[in-house]
Amino acid sequence: MTNFNYLKISTTRKIRYLKLHQKNATYIVFLHGFMSDLEGKKPQAFLKFAKKNKISFLALEYSGHGKSSGKFINGNISKWTRDTTLVIQKVVKKNDIIFIGSSMGAWIALNQFSLIKNKIKGFLGIGSAPEFLDKLMWNKFSNKMKIEIKKKGVINLKHGDYEYPITYQLIKDGRKNKILSKKISQNINVTMVHGSKDKSVPVIYSKKVLKIFQSKKKKLVVIKNGDHSLSSPKWLKILKKELKLIIN
């Protein structure tokens, strides 16, 4: 059975997280995507990987996601970044970190570099989606949609079989978290993995992330016919292989 914990960050707010602690070991920190949670295949696969390889593991659900408290419509990149930092400070403490950022999780991970940079020893991005709120949502909204979201503060956006409530405050906050024009100087292993048939986020975003890093130890892996989530067994196998290369 998976052992979940809760971190109380205020009298009304708590963040659910999943932890495996191995003595003196580096932590793999998995950050999930937009409107996702820890019930998916990727966090479970990386938890098993950590157990097998005697590495510590941490994953969390941002406020308004999964079983963490709060409403999704009240959340934004700044709040979810802060949630992540608080849980890392509480759980990881002085151990080194290798980030795995899935989709929006890559954006949240990139934000951590200015906050806890000395502890970060590697980064694996999966279908990375930094700045997606402006570039992949707002810029594709019709004028009618833009007027509606400004007037009502929220719009329901259809994506496949799902409908997302997108708030104007979320869009505006995303603009305060621009990361693609920044530079990260640490010489760490950085690997971006992206599916060639990702219909949500174009491969160019993984390339943009690599440009942020001045490290010479960086690479892009494009998975032929891969989708956005890369959660099938054959793709999880590739992700675990790339993670092992980052660790070693």
Task: Report each predicted region and the residues it spans.
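N-terminal cap/lid segment of alpha/beta-hydrolase-fold proteins
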Residues: 1-22
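The alpha/beta-hydrolase serine catalytic core
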Residues: 12, 107, 119-217, 221-223, ...
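Short beta-strand element of the alpha/beta-hydrolase
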Residues: 25-33
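Alpha/beta-hydrolase active-site loop signature
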Residues: 35, 62-67, 130, 227
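Short substrate-entry loop that stabilizes the transition state in hydrolases
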Residues: 35-41
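Conserved alpha/beta-hydrolase
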Residues: 43, 47-69
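Catalytic nucleophile-loop/oxyanion-hole region of alpha/beta-hydrolase
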Residues: 66-91
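Gly/Ala-rich beta-loop-alpha elbow adjacent to hydrolase catalytic centers
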Residues: 101-109
